[in-house]
Every structure is written in structure tokens, then in C-alpha cells.
Regions:
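A short beta-loop-alpha structural element at the N-terminal edge
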Residues: 2-18, 150-172
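Active-site rim helix/loop that mediates acceptor-substrate recognition in acyltransferases
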Residues: 20, 28-66, 167-188
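Short hydrophobic beta-strand segments in globular cytosolic domains
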Residues: 62, 120, 131-133
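Conserved acetyl-CoA binding element of GNAT-fold acetyltransferases
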Residues: 68, 72-84
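Conserved beta-strand-loop-alpha-helix junction that forms the acyl-donor binding cleft
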Residues: 82, 112-121, 139-143
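Conserved acetyl-CoA pyrophosphate-binding loop and the N-cap/start of the following alpha-helix
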Residues: 85, 89-97
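Conserved GNAT acetyl-CoA-binding A-motif
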Residues: 102-113
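Conserved active-site tyrosine of GNAT-family acetyltransferases
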Residues: 125, 130
């Protein structure tokens, strides 16, 4: 059966959360989001519902891609297929389709993270031209983590705000998550 790509704008937060949870069923690690967690996480990361996709088999969701966007850079915040659709070469086809769409929308750079032991996903992303840049480690702490180091530069005043904007450039793509606020802020 052919899958149909549908922009995430066509779904509610509740539906997207349910689809994400279904697509991550039987994943390497448990992935379950509440609606509130979904909205908080992906909103903070700059989720673009316009660029994000759900692939349908008839009326049934088969796959999802959550894309966060900042200017001409995008981050694949989540990409998963429901278990019944895995291992059929669809991940490659859907990723090629998504990357082509992002390129048409002016995206020049795409970042993503993948669990090192997810050999199928690592092979998929490498076959699409992605290269390993950083190793990420996951930790859980009850203490506050130090802020992400970032570099600040000032750019000319924005006529909309009548004040200079401060552009924050993360020191490495992992700061996208640790510093999920927008890259430009009005300077007070």
C-alpha cells in the first residue's frame, strides 16, 4: 500500500501525540509522551507543523516526522514508523521525500540525533549522507544543569521592533535541545 504524506497542521496535538507514541512502539527504549509533554517539548524546540509530516496508509498513521526549524536550519526532532511498517525500506523513501521537501522550503542544513545502538537508523542516515559529528550521552538528574555555552552577536535593529536583535548561535547542534529558545530575541 502506498503511503500519503500529510502536513502535521492537519492533526491536533492529541492526535500527533497518539501517532508519535504508536510509531515509537517497540522502540529500543520506551518512548511515551503525554499531550502536555509533547506540546512543551516540541514547542520549545521550535517544531514546525508546516514542515512536519504524518504518513498515512489509508486512514491509519504509519509514520511521523517532527521537524524543528530555525531559519535555514532544521532538526529532525523525531522520525519513526509503526512496527508493521519497519524493515521494508520505507524509512529511506520517506526520509528522501522529507529532505527534498525541506530543501524546497529553503532548508540548507539538517541535524538529527540517533541512538548509537539503533543500527538500522544509523545505517539509514549514513546512506542519506548524514555524518556523525558528536556523541551524545543521556543522563537524568534532579539538579539543574549548567546553561549551554552560546555565542552572542548583535545584528542591526529590526524595523518591526525598533530595537536591536540578539542572535544566539549554539556552540554545537546539541545546544538546539539544551537551549531550545528561538535564535533571535528582542534586546531589552
Amino acid at each position: 500500500m502506498e503511503l500519503t504524506a500529510v502536513p502535521a497542521t492537519q492533526f491536533s496535538s492529541v492526535q500527533l501525540t497518539d501517532i508519535l507514541n504508536a510509531c515509537f512502539e517497540a522502540y529500543l527504549v520506551p518512548v511515551t509522551q503525554s499531550v502536555e509533554g509533547f506540546v512543551q517539548r516540541f514547542s520549545a524546540e521550535g517544531m514546525s507543523l508546516v514542515d512536519s509530516r504524518v504518513w498515512l496508509a489509508g486512514d491509519e498513521p504509519a509514520a511521523i516526522a517532527i521537524v524543528a526549524r530555525r531559519g535555514s536550519a532544521a532538526r529532525l526532532a523525531a522520525f519513526a514508523l509503526r512496527p508493521a511498517w519497519r524493515g521494508k525500506g520505507l524509512g529511506r523513501k520517506l526520509m528522501q521525500e522529507l529532505l527534498m521537501l525541506l530543501q524546497q522550503q529553503g532548508i540548507e542544513t539538517v541535524f538529527l540525533e540517533v541512538i548509537r545502538d539503533n543500527h538500522a537508523a544509523v545505517a539509514l542516515y549514513q546512506s542519506l549522507g548524514f555524518t556523525r559529528r558528536y556523541g551524545l550521552c543521556g543522563y537524568l538528574s534532579t539538579e539543574l544543569l549548567p546553561r549551554c555555552r552560546a555565542y552572542y552577536s548583535f545584528i542591526p535593529p529590526c524595523p518591526c521592533f525598533g530595537a536591536p536583535l540578539r542572535r544566539v548561535t549554539a556552540s554545537f547542534p546539541g545546544c538546539w535541545i539544551r537551549l531550545p529558545s528561538p535564535l533571535c530575541h528582542v534586546r531589552s
